[in-house]
């Protein structure tokens, strides 16, 4: 009879940013173990709080089913000698299976005959399996850094305090991570019962909520926080900033969420909202509140882990905590504005960008020139782009950014605006870091885009230029930088070539770079970013590979090619022409001679090769302006017309003819055919 199963691991406070991933991995690992063991169930649900990880499995089988295991022995030919007596190989195999050779059955197949032993294996009861399965599931958790506690050598992400394993109402005895299974479960630190006993898996998680004042259901806690925060924001006439990453973190910090609203002095709103929000969200884990026009209100929402009869005291305590941080931001803002941003430029000489690549002032000089070069290529204002490049890193020397590091860029924008800099220049100081993550907004102006690309390109070329390409870790965020450049070029439709950009960036480093292949390495790295990006966009790997095989170094051009090949693949002729291109490629690869530049029409003998040659010549001329215009979809649609003449050619023409002149001419025809497709992509790489 199937029963509900529970395992709860009580711990010290788990890392909040890792809590969901730990719980999900625990469930996935345990479920995989159950499947491998042949144990059926009706669903698994994970629970997670700061002080526990738990799984509840509905209707878990009480044991494995019995099964017949077939063990094949030696082939009959080697199991018996010429006189029909068992060989040592046969006897050893039989002895290992606890039988005699005479007791073995025989297995006959089309490939031969073997000795066979069928053994009935009794299924094990689930209670004898789950402890080991749970231990393996926990051992497989994504723990970046484990810790030891006490005098034990046992390691886990945090010290383990309790373990409860129940199958129905039966306690499963066992020890995991040095802790023996009992019926004791710990409640909330400050409310309810600090610990109590649980009689049955069926009682979980309700008993924990009723007696322990702990809401074990992670998603339920999150829902309470979201609903409570929205309601609280509406009560003060605003909208809560409920960024999912912060909501997840707060959910992982509390076992009994209570949503409260607090306020701060109106005068602090004179400080740029980004600085206030940084300290509220980053330091205090508060949710800021905005009005309908997205202006920050003097209120914030927070979540406490205790239900108090006097919530006013908790609110006042949080207001008291945040006030000095906001006062610091106000002080830094007022102090920083006493000096123009440009006056901080010489101070960048004191800040090292990278030991071999120089100071941030050196980087600023390179960004300034590179931004001007890019601006010229895309039609942006060169003077504004260079001015923005010159000011780009000056805010790193301000008190505000030194204290609140995540405000870099945005504070530069505010200080530049205060100094009377051009609006586009000021905006570029903020937008130089865009896109900051997958799906983030792009720089909104061409000036901003010039500076953003210059900054990222300088970092890429510099770090690759000293031989520090990312492997596992990526301390300079080169993958993000490469993808950012590609997104800006593709999504804004800039006609930029990576070869030119990298060459210009490389030239600005003088003799600082030691990697002679930096240009190739950077471009290959950037093209590699296309693969992950376009896969995420829904394009299949073979389509992406078909285009990358041509190594297109203009990102906007790559985008057009991928979309054209994707469209081509849906055509009826695609599969046949892909196979034909693969065949042509194989034929040409085996030929080590020199092909002619043009087809000799006088040497064409078979009707099929005459038709194909004529079609190829016509298309080659007709498609030349289409290729130049980059209209690859139209080109591939026209090339699809080659399906029938290509099929007829391979059906009726011997390519590798005995006559050398005929063979060379036919190979030249096939080469010209293949090059028409290779002008766009290597479609031979397309899969069925």
Curated annotation (Swiss-Prot):
Q: What class of enzyme is it?
A: ligase
List locations, semicolon-separated.
Answer: Cytoplasm
Q: Which UniProt keywords apply?
A: Aminoacyl-tRNA synthetase, ATP-binding, Cytoplasm, Ligase, Nucleotide-binding, Protein biosynthesis
Query: Which branch of life, at top level?
Result: Bacteria
- Please state the Enzyme Commission number of this protein: 6.1.1.14
Its cellular-component GO annotations read: cytosol
Question: Which InterPro entries did the record assign?
Answer: DALR_anticod-bd, Gly-tRNA-synth_bsu, Gly-tRNA-synth_heterodimer
Molecular functions per Gene Ontology = arginine-tRNA ligase activity; ATP binding; glycine-tRNA ligase activity
UniProt main location, coarse = cytoplasm
Q: Which GO terms describe its biological process?
A: arginyl-tRNA aminoacylation; glycyl-tRNA aminoacylation
Tell me what reaction this enzyme catalyses: tRNA(Gly) + glycine + ATP = glycyl-tRNA(Gly) + AMP + diphosphate
User: Can you tell me where the transmembrane regions are?
Assistant: none
Q: How does it assemble?
A: Tetramer of two alpha and two beta subunits.
The UniProt entry, under PANTHER family, shows: GLYCINE--TRNA LIGASE, CHLOROPLASTIC_MITOCHONDRIAL 2 (PTHR30075:SF2), GLYCYL-TRNA SYNTHETASE (PTHR30075)
Task: State the NCBIfam families in the record.
Answer: glyS
Q: Which family does it belong to?
A: Belongs to the class-II aminoacyl-tRNA synthetase family.
This one is known as Glycine--tRNA ligase beta subunit
